[in-house]
Amino acid sequence: MTKYTEQEQIRRDKLEFYKKFDVVPFKKAYGLGKLSTSDELNKKYGQFAREELEAKKVKKNISGRLITARGPFLVLKDRKGTIQVYFNKKENPELTKIVETFDLGDILWVRGLLMKTHTGEMTVRAQDIQLLTKALKPLPDKFHGLTDTEERYRHRYLDLITNPESRNTFIMRTKIVQWIRDYFNKLDYLEAETPFLHDYLSGAAAKPFTTHHNSLNQDFVLRIATEIPLKKLVVGGFERVYEMGRIFRNEGYDTTHNPEFTTIEFYEAYSNVEGMMNRTETLIKELCKKIGKSKFVTNGVEVDLSKPFKRVNMIDEVSKKTGKNFRKITLEEAIEVAKAYKIKIEKFFTIGHIINALYEELVEPTLIQPTFLYGHPIEISPLSAKSDDPRFTERAELFINTKEYANMYTELSDPIDQLERFESQLEEKNKGNDEASDIDYDFVDALEYGMPPTGGCGIGIDRLVMLLTETDSIRDVLLFPTLKRIKK
């Protein structure tokens, strides 16, 4: 038998009381009339003096969650804010019996005349009040909010009710996502939807989640990127295309990583890595204009997004940090340098892998203000076109306060080179690199029909929202972050 707290039992007992008065505690939304929100009433009627508003006899319908009750005054919270209700018990003796059963958290409907109190607060003088939904559990901590971080994530609905900061963060996330879509739509990009289930591992260096399709009797992986299908669309004539959606990677779990997260990938024919850097920088600066500021604090560090983003070469930076010229170094010499910095040498490591490992160890932690780092080794960039020096590629990553925010290429359009890259990745996988790509013959086949020279970029939406809302944990910008199951 279910055990209820004292407060929960009191609320459930009221259900029997409602039956006697034909009160439906869980109504359907019929006959409510046109509803006004709190901000609509304040914007339209806030300028009127108390006497003027009373003389106008403006009748309105409102709905919201009861968050405060003191004497004859009730405060309801709707999607836009709060609105006060005045209920005179002497004028409504029969209705008073019902109103006195209301609890904080109940969802109410009110019809009445607009008025202002002596302090000038917009108020609805109730002529009728109905219970729409009875809250059978009390709100936490008398509506002062959830303070336990884990509880906030597990019960996001309560977090949104009780914590205005959290609610505002997710409202801003919605706006940022819409602004990003608007940015690309105005540039004549087409939005695409590509499969979540892939029968190959490609598009990024990451460990996948796997699943099995019973009818096809075939294993699939949840997508780790949208790159391959989007580039197939470029082959098909979608010369400007993007997709914003969920990505799944069976990897780390910390303040900047969640197993499922949101990215936008966009591809533009007749562009290159330079064009993608320009697109990305312009997008971020446009978002700053929408928000109304360009300086943000992330993990205690202020970053300025208004200035031109720096552009530095990976090989040059690694060479500076180590004092070794990595353009003219042998594998044996590179291994010795790596060992000096206590970098673990894997079986599949080449000079390119060592450069990448040293860059992650020595350079990444120094990239505070917005910086594009370009010129990655070919070994870690199997989908990127070669630069003039064929050991390196036309690839760039955007870093802000040591974190990667975007990854962009001049896309590899040569199908012969692409197949060789895939084969090299397979060799790495056989040597123990479980993040290496599979051979995607279908993609190679698509390239053989001809893909125009193309620039492509992927941006992590969650991290970008974290930056623009000055939030330090990814779980604070995900409505329902992945959490470890607990036994009830």
From Swiss-Prot:
Residues that span the membrane, as ranges: none
Cofactor list: Mg(2+)
Binding site for Mg(2+) 1: 397, 404
Catalytic activity annotation: tRNA(Lys) + L-lysine + ATP = L-lysyl-tRNA(Lys) + AMP + diphosphate
GO biological process, one term: lysyl-tRNA aminoacylation
UniProt-listed Gene3D superfamilies: Bira Bifunctional Protein, Domain 2 (3.30.930.10), Nucleic acid-binding proteins (2.40.50.140)
EC number per UniProt: 6.1.1.6
UniProt enzyme class: ligase
Presence of the UniProt keyword Ribosomal protein in the record: no
Membership in a protein family: Belongs to the class-II aminoacyl-tRNA synthetase family.
Protein name: Lysine--tRNA ligase
